[in-house]
Amino acid sequence: MTETSIIPVFFATDENYVPYLGVSLQSLIAHTAHNKQYEIYILHDSLSEHAQQQLREFKQKNVNISFLKVSDHLQQYQSRLKNNLAFWNQPTYYRLALPLLTANYDKILYCDCDTVFL
């Protein structure tokens, strides 16, 4: 498979948004091209094994699902983030780690957990 036929898709979530992410994944998978490979990466800090297993059930022949714990990558930002966590939840900041996690891709697609693909 060539690199152009791989589509990396990133989501960030915590335990509270797993049901919404499930809907998003279901709608994405319903609209995938069978000749493309979709690499789904779920950014999290402490997603339970149960939640991860629920999301793994969306795996298909052309859809792989991986979990990336981002807390290690965000440690350098912790002091700056602490003051802003009152305004946004922590998964909002997981996007800061994307440049560190996506170096082997020219392009990625980042989607919020409540995205519905039509």
What residue spans do the PLM features occupy?
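Active-site-proximal specificity loops/subdomain of glycosyltransferases
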Residues: 50-52, 56-100
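Short internal beta-strands
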Residues: 38-46
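Residues at the C-termini of beta-strands that transition into short coil/loop
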Residues: 13, 44, 69-71
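An acidic- and aromatic-residue-enriched active-site/binding cleft used to recognize and process polar
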Residues: 14-16, 45-46, 113-115
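Residues at the starts of beta-strands that form the adenosine-phosphate
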Residues: 37-39, 64, 107
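GT-A fold catalytic core of metal-dependent nucleotide-sugar glycosyltransferases
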Residues: 91-118
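N-proximal low-complexity "stem/linker" segments adjacent to membrane-targeting elements
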Residues: 1-26, 30
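Short, surface-exposed alpha-helical segments at coil->helix boundaries
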Residues: 22-25, 49-53
